[in-house]
Regions:
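Structural beta-alpha unit
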Residues: 1-8, 106-139, 145-150, 159, ...
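Redox- and metal-dependent alpha/beta enzyme cores, enriched for Fe-S-associated oxidoreductases
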Residues: 58-110, 114
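Intrinsically disordered or low-complexity boundary/linker segments at protein termini
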Residues: 1-82, 163-173
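Short, small-residue-enriched loops and turns at beta-alpha junctions
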Residues: 16-17, 87-92, 118-121, 147
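Charged helix-capping and loop-helix junction motifs
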Residues: 22-24, 95-98, 128, 153-158
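Short Asp/Glu-rich motifs
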Residues: 21, 48, 92, 123-124, ...
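Short glycine/serine/threonine-biased micro-segments
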Residues: 53, 140-143, 153-154
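Active-site proximal loops enriched in glycine and acidic residues that flank catalytic Cys/His/Asp
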Residues: 83, 115, 142-143, 171-173
Length: 173
């Protein structure tokens, strides 16, 4: 059904109320070919596009998410590209922040690029802390950049973000 719409909107799972949308979120990401916004179960107000943070690791999923989010990025007052520096983002073959910044500039979207080292903190916590510190109103990211099996066994950024998010998350795969 999601294939027939520009965007799907799904509420975050809420264990307290017995709502588990993780299967629906995964199915929408993998099978619809369309982006989705996952809304935190604590969300009370309407979607605000004041400040958008885009996670960037140079992956296909990140490229897809940023390009699918172009209509929203154009409406934002501020757009930030956030890079958690690790082995993957340090690789010369990965499209760097300046290149994707030039791409967005061709769409009349100005960005600020922020980087932070991965250190000993897991990536989802780094991202969520940055989103809170920057007062972002929307997070854009690629969803499930690794195989579902790897994400299930080892965990991953997508699962970590979806379990503890406090702002809506725009995702594409």
């Amino acid at each position: 059904m999601a294939r027939c719409f520009d965007l799907s909107i799904i509420m975050q799972s809420d264990d307290y109320r017995g709502i588990n949308n993780s299967t629906l979120i995964e199915a929408t990401l993998f099978d619809s070919g369309r982006p989705l916004i996952v809304v935190p179960y604590i969300q009370q107000e309407r979607l605000n596009l004041d400040r958008i943070v885009c996670c960037w690791d140079g992956s296909r999923a990140a490229v897809r998410a940023i390009n699918d989010a172009l209509p929203l990025l154009r409406k934002a007052n501020a757009v930030e590209l956030f890079i958690v520096e690790n082995e993957k983002t340090a690789n010369d073959s990965v499209i760097g922040g300046s290149e994707i910044g030039r791409h967005l500039a061709r769409h009349d979207i100005r960005i600020e690029v922020r980087t932070t080292p991965a250190a000993d903190i897991d990536v989802p916590n780094i991202i969520l802390s940055h989103v809170a510190d920057s007062a972002a109103s929307l997070l854009v990211m690629g969803g499930y950049g690794h195989s579902r099996l790897r994400e299930f066994v080892l965990g991953g950024a997508t699962r970590g973000i979806l379990s503890a998010m406090t702002v809506p998350v725009f995702m594409s795969h």
